[in-house]
C-alpha cells in the first residue's frame, strides 16, 4: 500500500502546489449552517446529483437553470403536487434532460422530503442532527427513503450539500457489497 505522504506529494505536484491543493479540499458546513439551508435547495441539489449520475456534470449544470424553472424552484410542496401529466410533459421538454425515470423521481423525492419535514421540521435540521459517526446509516436512510440515491449518489449528494462524509471507491463498493 502506498503511504499517504507519497499520494499527497503527487497531488500537490499535479495541481500546482500546497495552496492549489488546499483550495480544492472540501470544507464541510457546520451543523448550524446545514439546518439553515432551505428545503427547496436540498431538493434541487439532490435531484441535480441524480441527473449527474451517468452524465457529465457540465451538461447537467448547463441545463440546471431550466430545471429550476420547470420544477418551480424546487418548492417541495409544489413539486410533490405535480401530477403524471405534468411530469410526462417535462419528460419531453428539450430544455431538460429527458430521462423519464429521473423526471418522475423528482416528484417522488419531494413527497419523501415532505415526510421528513413533517417529522423533523426541515430536511436541513435532520441532516444537521445526524450523528457524524453514523455516516453509512445516513447513506442507507437516504437510499431507502428517496428514489435514485443508491450507490455513491447519497454520499455525493451529501458532499454537494456540505455535509461531512466520505466517498467509497468502486473497488471498496464491489468488495464490501454495502450497496
Describe the residue ranges of each PLM region.
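PRPP/pyrophosphate-binding module of the type I phosphoribosyltransferase fold
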Residues: 153
